[in-house]
């Protein structure tokens, strides 16, 4: 893989960033890479005997090889299922770059590729003074865009790609994640996305209820 790490963002909340990220991890591992996931900030965590845990972060941990320590994979685990800025304020936490950068550096020593999953859509802030673009810039990461394929996705994908470029960052690929089984003319919509997005498509994840990320990884075609 040309890039030792990349940042996975999405066209919105709930469009399958975690499925895209875990499928990427399995695809990378299938190529023989040591690949680990990271979820720098996660809200909506549940309290367990081991501490606060997030479902998406646990999925990334399970898909990783080697499997990193949870606190390194998810430095900020916030209880409330809210925007990170609000969830952090609820527990008196101020999100900062330094702990994330430190954890990221540790993960880089453990694997060949680190897949960093963002929060919500690209413009969702991390705090009052910290945008996702700031984090991506600080970690010097290219971006992979997961497009939730449903009505309106062409608009959302083009706006997100334009926002990433306007922030001076590079989007190196996109993944079509089919999230609406009732969507009409899906092939044509994906074709329109291919025509209008400048970066290459890294494959598609079909609507397949109950399928795990390892199975969905077969739909991806990663660059060499």
Curated annotation (Swiss-Prot):
GO terms for cellular component: cytosol
Gene3D superfamilies linked: P-loop containing nucleotide triphosphate hydrolases
Binding-site list for Mg(2+): 18, 56, 117
Pfam families xref list: AAA_26 (PF13500)
Keywords of the record: ATP-binding, Biotin biosynthesis, Cytoplasm, Ligase, Magnesium, Metal-binding, Nucleotide-binding
Pathway recorded for this protein: Cofactor biosynthesis; biotin biosynthesis; biotin from 7,8-diaminononanoate: step 1/2
Principal subcellular localization: cytoplasm
Binding site for substrate: 43
GO term, biological process aspect, one: biotin biosynthetic process
Cofactor(s) demanded: Mg(2+)
UniProt-annotated catalytic positions: 39
EC number: 6.3.3.3
PANTHER family: DETHIOBIOTIN SYNTHETASE
Family recorded in the similarity comment: Belongs to the dethiobiotin synthetase family.
Its job: Catalyzes a mechanistically unusual reaction, the ATP-dependent insertion of CO2 between the N7 and N8 nitrogen atoms of 7,8-diaminopelargonic acid (DAPA, also called 7,8-diammoniononanoate) to form a ureido ring.
HAMAP family named in the record: BioD
Protein's UniProt name: ATP-dependent dethiobiotin synthetase BioD
Organism listed in the record: Xanthomonas euvesicatoria pv. vesicatoria (strain 85-10)
């Amino acid at each position: 893989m040309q890039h030792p790490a990349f940042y996975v963002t999405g066209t919105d909340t709930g469009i399958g960033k975690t499925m895209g990220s875990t499928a990427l991890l399995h695809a990378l591992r299938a190529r023989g890479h040591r690949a680990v996931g990271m979820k720098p900030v996660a809200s909506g965590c549940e309290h367990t005997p081991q501490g606060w845990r997030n479902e998406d972060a646990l999925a990334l941990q399970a898909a990783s090889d080697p499997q990193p320590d949870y606190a390194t994979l998810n430095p900020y685990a916030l209880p409330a299922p809210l925007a990170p800025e609000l969830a952090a304020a609820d527990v008196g936490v101020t999100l900062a770059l330094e702990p994330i950068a430190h954890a990221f550096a540790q993960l880089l020593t453990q694997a060949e590729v680190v897949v960093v999953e963002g929060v919500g859509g690209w413009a969702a802030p991390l705090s009052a003074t910290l945008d996702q673009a700031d984090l991506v810039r600080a970690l010097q990461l290219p971006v992979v865009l997961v497009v939730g394929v449903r009505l309106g996705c062409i608009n959302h994908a083009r706006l997100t790609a334009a926002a990433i470029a306007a922030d001076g960052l590079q989007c190196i690929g996109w993944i079509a994640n089919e999230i609406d089984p009732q969507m009409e003319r899906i092939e044509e919509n994906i074709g329109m996305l291919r025509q209008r997005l400048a970066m290459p498509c890294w494959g598609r994840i079909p609507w397949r209820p109950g399928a795990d990320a390892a199975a969905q990884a077969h739909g991806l075609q990663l660059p060499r």
